[in-house]
């Protein structure tokens, strides 16, 4: 293992000792926020320290076995012990490398998922509805909560745009690689002659701000408009000005919410979406600066990146970032996304490990 990595592990082991001492103090719970922060840090450091302790023990075992090689009676035993210790060291080194990978601070957050119809007109809007169902079904399989924050329906029951909030354990970490362009190839319901059409939607996955105050929004930078809600096809909606449109003047971000009959609740939803979009914009700007020196194999998550194709006649889903094709389109569209999402996470981890090797 490289000296830089060993030094990092020594620092983490020392920090765990410090955290243990702080948590053992009589007044540890006097500041509950600080106590929670220390508890989370303890939970993150403990597995690393435990693995590092095992690694050092394996090093000691190797040194002891090598010292026995000069004893003719112990030579065979020592050779077996050396082989076993080297195997343990190799496995522990790989495990420690994974534990040392930089953690995305947003991984444990809830998220906002936005789907927009793109090229393809009404068929694109219908595909947006299919994607919404796919993500909703996946969330249900994880026992996550799903809430519609904003929706704009098309005439045939699709969506020009829809935003949902997904709340659950490590939700963002599982779905964060879904941002980008999703292309569909199929015979549309509106096609009379059976020709295959290509349409597209864009998906944006944004970590939810822990609270709106986490993202600084100056009230003077907001323009708030209220108007009467309206639905597709002349559906009945309430007759008061309950719909809310927020315009963030510095960034030009516009958010509309009209799904609730309460103007106050619509404004609360709109503020959550606005905070997430501003945070997402800030995160992408930081990632763009980082990407100038290193390109992530999974891609930037930019909406202009075509990341996946859903080919219904062939029954396949292809993720272009990792060259993965799965012939189980019906299962995936029904929310069975684990194989796909796990492959993306594994590729991302491999990319991080390669970067760690370059930096070490």
Swiss-Prot record:
Residue ranges the record marks as coiled coil: none
Residues modified as N5-methylglutamine: 235
Principal subcellular localization: cytoplasm
Pfam family, any one: PCRF
InterPro entries, per the entry: PCRF, Pep_chain_release_fac_I, Pep_chain_release_fac_I_sf, Prokaryotic/Mito_RF, RF-1
Entry PTM: Methylated by PrmC. Methylation increases the termination efficiency of RF1.
UniProt keyword terms in alphabetical order: Cytoplasm, Methylation, Protein biosynthesis
Domain of life: Bacteria
Record HAMAP family: Rel_fac_1 (MF_00093)
Similarity remark: Belongs to the prokaryotic/mitochondrial release factor family.
Full protein name: Peptide chain release factor 1
Record organism: Cupriavidus taiwanensis (strain DSM 17343 / BCRC 17206 / CCUG 44338 / CIP 107171 / LMG 19424 / R1)
